[in-house]
């Protein structure tokens, strides 16, 4: 089996939970006996602004696994916010329970009360296992919800800017590999035709590229074949890794760059929307040794985050698209730094983000409502 499960990844994590906890500014354990709510909110860093991160609901087998997951994800959001250059820090929340059986309106209202108790230090929204409908209930108790539908004052479908950011990531990867960023005439293997992956395939086809696709959704496959005709080839979920293509575009699962897939990959670059594509950090070095250019996922998939962050300043689609375009230049900066300093692109991306956070410390060391930073929209 090529994919590594989330539970196995968390169990294999040998780092001390206590060490991970002390990296964070604040951790809130939420328990409401009346509704059965058990949740954890982790605020990793608010140097650049209030913490921002989605809320997952999953049937974690132990509290320890839930804590490990929320600590890992909240730290990742700090880097993702820095990469997207939005004035927010990193946070995350998890609700312990089966999203198919354990949801109630009362439970999400109770969760909203815990969010409200943080007084704006943490904003959250949907993630794996939660929906917009869930947060309609939470919004009755708190104003600190983002990623709302248009009818509730939000920016709408975040997969649109996310897919656009992935497309800019592909073009930046092409620029570094081939000396030009054109999509036409090149081949892209796309894993997953969900809300984001399908739109990425559309962008590629519309600009004259060829796609090799895989997905379990037969309707999505039929639709993309109808759109692209001979520019589309369909393969199985296992075959997608061994396709001869210019760029691999993972838009489904995490952990897809691992010991098994590295043996069969036949691409020049990787740029996709899936989170945590490297099963382990050492796989970034193995990609470098194989001469495969990796566009760090948390930069590439930042378009949705940019839209969500924009909601808090008054939704402006033109501003979102302009800021999403910066993903292209950020990746070129990362690629250049990695080449210059003989390091992996993942390490170069982390260093870029750490510098942005360090620079922000000169202006703002800890977020409160009274010192909320403002975007400079003219940059």
From Swiss-Prot:
Keywords: NAD, Oxidoreductase. NAD(+) binds at residues 56, 127, 158, 162, 192-198, 215-216, 252-253, 273-275. SUPFAM superfamilies: Aminoacid dehydrogenase-like, N-terminal domain, NAD(P)-binding Rossmann-fold domains. InterPro entries: Aminoacid_DH-like_N_sf, Glu/Leu/Phe/Val/Trp_DH, Glu/Leu/Phe/Val/Trp_DH_C, Glu/Leu/Phe/Val/Trp_DH_dimer, Glu/Leu/Phe/Val_DH_AS, Glu/Phe/Leu/Val/Trp_DH_bac/arc, NAD(P)-bd_dom_sf. The active site is at 92. Its EC number is 1.4.1.20. It catalyses: L-phenylalanine + NAD(+) + H2O = 3-phenylpyruvate + NH4(+) + NADH + H(+). GO terms for biological process: L-phenylalanine biosynthetic process. GO terms for molecular function: phenylalanine dehydrogenase activity. L-phenylalanine binds at residues 80, 275. Pathway: Amino-acid biosynthesis; L-phenylalanine biosynthesis; L-phenylalanine from phenylpyruvate (PDH route): step 1/1. Pfam families: ELFV_dehydrog, ELFV_dehydrog_N. The keyword NAD applies. Belongs to the Glu/Leu/Phe/Val dehydrogenases family. PANTHER family: LEUCINE DEHYDROGENASE, VALINE DEHYDROGENASE. Catalyzes the reversible NAD(+)-dependent oxidative deamination of L-phenylalanine to phenylpyruvate. This is Phenylalanine dehydrogenase. It comes from Sporosarcina ureae.
